[in-house]
Amino acid sequence: MPGKPLVSAIIIFWNEEQFIEEAIESVFAQTYGHWELLLVEDGSSDGSSEIARRYTEQYPDKVRYLEHRGHENRGMSASRNLGVRSARGRYISYLDGDDVWLPTKLEEQVAIMESNPTADMVLAPLLMWFSWTGNCQNRHLDQPYGVGRNGKHPYTDTLVEPPRLLALFLRYEQYIPSGFLAKRDVMEQIGEYEEQFRDAYSDAVALVKVCLKSPVYVSSKRWYRYRKHTASNTYLSRLHGKEDEEQQIYLNWVAAYFNQQKVQDPELLKIINKMLFRCRHPRLRSLERNLFYTTEKAFHYVKRIFWFLINLQRQKSLHTQQGKK
């Protein structure tokens, strides 16, 4: 496709036999056709490797299969690094083996990047996808992530200069999105993914590096469905009580990276110091969480009482008017 930039779509997977075919098909369903697909195997022991190899055999001009030496399991960061080193596209975008893209993702993200030549990356919220089960009772659980509590990102449909977006990410993790599209040379310039982060915070670390120095476009559209299930890394981390420990490791890395990069921005330094203080004092953090949830619960009760009284007053007014007639 002359004139259209090539996109390297990178799917990393580990034991995703149940879902990987749907992930791959979501790339083939893209309305933007100028892409290559790199399937990065991370040491699976189920049938997902065979599925990936089948696509490579059927579509050798579009799909490539990669794996670590000795079929080793090395984690998400090492697998993404393998994908980036093998990519040929002007742009790079990632998809986990259990998630899916919506059909217009690449077309619309490439259009945004081409219309904003100074942007190094485009970010967007995602859908926390519970309804993939087909159970209608799960439909109401689907919700956007990466937009904040009011349902809107503070910088929506805006090209954000560094490091404003990073300050937001560090303060509020719910604004960390997924399914981004970035310039390949930018991903190469920031250095590789940090392989100490095998699972949790793998993407967040890369975003810290990009958002510290690069202009980033924040879109309001959702192109990425993040499948929620009991075998996901997020669920297992919470189940085994590792969330706080993993966050502290991440924040310590951010502080060390700021020191390495000689960051002088007072807002960023204030935020990271505050976040580290909270992380190192779990009792204070627990108290803060409980206070937040108690306040939020009380607010909902007050809101319900308020609307009950409003409706009661309306009914009284209606009865009064009917009585006068």
Task: Kindly give the residue locations of the regions a language model identified.
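Short aromatic/hydrophobic "clamp" motif used to bind/position activated sugar donors
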Residues: 92
